[in-house]
Structures are given as structure tokens and as C-alpha cells.
């Protein structure tokens, strides 16, 4: 049996068009592998989306990632890189992808199709990004899954999409019906780990999203980030927190004074104001921002008079693009088409676009 490090969805890229954000990603990537060395793990498993850009990858970004991985090619552990949707050129084919060259490194394996692999005494099923896990799980051995682990990159119904609380609504066409892709599909496994959604979360005792190792956007504001060390002998997990990468904050204007410079320095902050600021108030706010050393800031204005029922209606519809799709199909004339299938296709398109 073995000690295995799991991480996912690092999306290396100069996010926000800032070189510093690229450096944040590279620093987090080094930290992951340094932890693997320090913890003396037997393997590193990555759950997909190593790079952010799908089709036009910056040469500097790609080279720096390659250099970091190359530094760990002679360590006493093997690294397995699973294919995520951001690693794929085509949305529905694994054939062309950006992680393939990393498989040329010693002790690195890229997994670009469903595969069963024995890793230091434990058996793992790998499931690259898929729109239809029902179909692709059938490509893996069915027997004795209760003793095996799964690492996949996909959408699961009911999972949290972001820190605002939006929830995934995921269905696919299977055997002529629209079927929910829910956590029960993976209940047979000893433990199932997933990449794709960036918020670490447990959907069941044995089903969880690993989450990204650093905050990449305001959609991850307030989320703690970690990597996982799995002891397959004891089937126990240690969560190692990333306490160094910049964070994202939503802060009400009147609460800004309650934060320290240490908390906000080099962070990304969205200050929520109650209305348009006077010249004097704007100057006071700018002084506070400067004194706190905030690296990046944007302002967001609250509506002054919005009734509760309007807010609730907006949350029900606008916060979830799936609701918009369902509403649209209800209102247009599509009697000659299967509405459930049409809605399912729309949701898949929306999910793919939102992942971009």
C-alpha cells in the first residue's frame, strides 16, 4: 500500500492578464511537488486542467510548467496526469491535447483514455473529461470496484459550482432517457476523487471534488485551498492547506476597517458599496485601499431599493443558466422535438462554455 498525493485544476495561466498571476500558479505547482518530496509519497495524481488555455498556449507558460515538472522527474515517485477539458483541443475528443508531451519525462504518465492502473499496491480507475460517464465507465473493469479508487474529471449533479452557492444540474442522454449524473454512480468505489469544479467538497462519504490548489477567481472567494495525502493502507486522508497564495475577497464598504494589511496585502478585493460615492467618500476609500496594500481592487454597487421577491426570483433564474434553458424550451414551439433531450444538450453546451 502507498501514500498518494492528489491535486487538481491548477489552470496555469497569467489570469487577469497579469504576469504575477502566472507566477502564483507556478509557485503553487512547485509547492505541490515539494510537498510530495517532503511527505515521501509513492505517487502524485493530478485530476486534470494543468493549463488554462485550450488551443493557444503561451510558449513561456508552457516552458515554465515543463521546467518545473522536469525538476521532479528523478524523484522516488511517479506522477500521473489525467486529461481535463482545458487540456483538450476538441470538446468531445481526447486525441489532441496539451499534456501529451509531459509523458516523455521520466516517471511521468499522461492518462488520456479510461484506464485501470496499479499504483503501489492499490488499483485506480482513471476517467478523463467526459460528457457521458455512464458510457465511459463501461470501458473500465466492472469487478471488485469496492476495493478500487477512481480519479475522474467531470460534472456531477448537485455539486457546488462556486462560492456564491450555485449548484450543478447535470443530466445526459443514456439508454434513450435523460438521466442525472449524480454521486450514486460512483458509490461502488472505495473512494472517488474528481477534478473539474474548483471548490473542494464532499458529495458523499466516498465521493469528493479535490478542488483547485489556489484561488483563481472571485468565484472561489472565501474558499480554503488544499492538496490531499491519501494513505491507501489505512484509507485515511490528510488535507494540506495552501496558506500562501493570494486570495479573493468580497467586502462591504463599511466592513473594510475590520481587515488588516496582513490579510489583504497582495490580495484581490471587490468592495461592495451601497451607492454612488461622493468625491470625499471616494477619496477616503482610496486612502484605506492604499494603506491596506491591496494589490487589485474593483468596486461593486448594491442596488438601493430591490424587493426581496425580486432578488429571490433572480436567484432562481439568473444564477443558474440551466433554469434559463428550461424556461426557453418551455416557451418556444418545439413540439416536433424531444424536449428533455433538447434541454440536456443545451445544458451540456452551457457547461462547456462556462468552463471556458
For the regions a protein language model found, what residue spans apply to each?
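Divalent metal-coordination and catalytic microenvironments
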Residues: 9, 29, 44, 49, ...
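Active-site environment of divalent metal-dependent phosphoester hydrolases
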Residues: 11-15, 52-55, 81-93, 117-118, ...
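Conserved catalytic scaffold of divalent metal-dependent phosphoesterases
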Residues: 65, 87-178, 213
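Conserved beta-sheet core of the metallophosphoesterase superfamily
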Residues: 156, 162-234
